[in-house]
């Protein structure tokens, strides 16, 4: 059984050991559960401990170094939660990174999207993370259910709940979990962030680099959405920014709107025969039936075009003049 170990020889032979993990940022171990106690040790977030006994809201534990003491049970999570995080990290091991970001505050890493879901690890303010996926979870407004101002059940339900965006992230230690999206500031390069036009950046990628004098300048694919949580799509617009080496500025080489986009977006370099090796990217979009299809694009700077599979037809998209940014 996960989290349960058989002890070795001696008096404890055959006794099942229960393991747990510290979910609090830090907690003290005490020699008694009474109001007056002595500190026997300190455990930190993520530490593994053995449960020796339980008494009301406390558990007596033994650390890996052999220190024993009482700790509040609310500071612990069972082995099953730890195993869940290990499984999640394994499942998302090869998930393509959609963006990088920095935590705005200390924040908990959840096993599933939602404020009330299990959490184990805590990320410190300023932690660097990689964005993998997006999801939404319902946030119930405190006290909303106690206000029967409408007899319309649908209106009452909408007033009582809000949808929040969550990011699935990987930290620098390889831990994977869900955090509130508003707790992470994406590290969007300033030179393209200024052209977001009030929209929210969801993902960004370097397609390639061009030479301008003695420096290399990146060209970007940026995926955006409306500036609010709870939308039914991960993104609904994409833009490609290319660098004009004559005018030394970014220009919008491609823009597409009204997408029902689904992460992940994937970027690669691909051989296109006579055109040579070019940057390519794939967008995943959902139709009205909920079916997801892939759209491939290639960029032969500064032109971006769809790459149609055999038998595939391109939806009609109105041509757009190139936007210039000063």
Predicted stretch roles:
Residues 5-8:
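C-terminal motif of bacterial Sec signal peptides marking the signal peptidase cleavage site
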């Amino acid at each position: 059984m996960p989290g349960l170990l058989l002890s070795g020889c001696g008096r404890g032979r055959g006794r099942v050991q229960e393991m747990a993990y510290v979910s609090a940022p830090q907690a003290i171990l005490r020699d008694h559960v009474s109001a007056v106690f002595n500190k026997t040790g300190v455990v930190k977030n993520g530490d593994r401990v053995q449960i020796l006994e339980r008494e009301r809201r406390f558990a007596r534990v033994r650390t890996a170094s052999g220190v024993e003491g009482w700790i509040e049970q609310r500071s612990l999570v069972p082995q099953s939660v730890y195993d869940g995080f290990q499984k999640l990290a394994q499942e998302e091991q090869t998930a393509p990174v959609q963006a990088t970001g920095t935590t705005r505050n200390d924040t908990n890493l959840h096993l599933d999207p939602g404020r009330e879901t299990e959490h184990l690890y805590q990320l410190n303010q300023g932690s660097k993370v990689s964005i993998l996926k997006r999801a939404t979870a319902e946030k119930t407004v405190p006290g909303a259910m106690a206000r029967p101002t409408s007899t319309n059940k649908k209106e009452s339900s909408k007033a009582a709940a809000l949808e929040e965006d969550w990011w699935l992230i990987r930290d620098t230690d390889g831990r994977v979990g869900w955090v509130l999206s508003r707790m992470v500031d994406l590290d969007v390069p300033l030179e393209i962030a200024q052209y977001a036009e009030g929209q929210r950046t969801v993902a960004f990628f370097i397609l390639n680099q061009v030479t301008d004098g003695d420096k290399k300048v990146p060209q970007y694919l940026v995926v955006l959405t409306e500036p609010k949580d709870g939308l039914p799509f991960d993104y609904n617009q994409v833009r490609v920014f290319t660098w004009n080496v004559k005018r030394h500025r970014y220009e919008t080489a491609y823009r597409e709107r009204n997408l029902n986009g689904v992460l992940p977006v994937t970027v690669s370099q691909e051989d296109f025969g006579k055109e040579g090796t070019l940057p390519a990217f794939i967008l995943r979009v959902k139709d009205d039936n909920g079916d997801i299809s892939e759209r491939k694009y290639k960029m032969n700077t500064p032109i971006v075009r769809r790459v149609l599979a055999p038998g595939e037809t391109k939806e009609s998209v109105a041509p757009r003049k190139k936007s210039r940014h000063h």
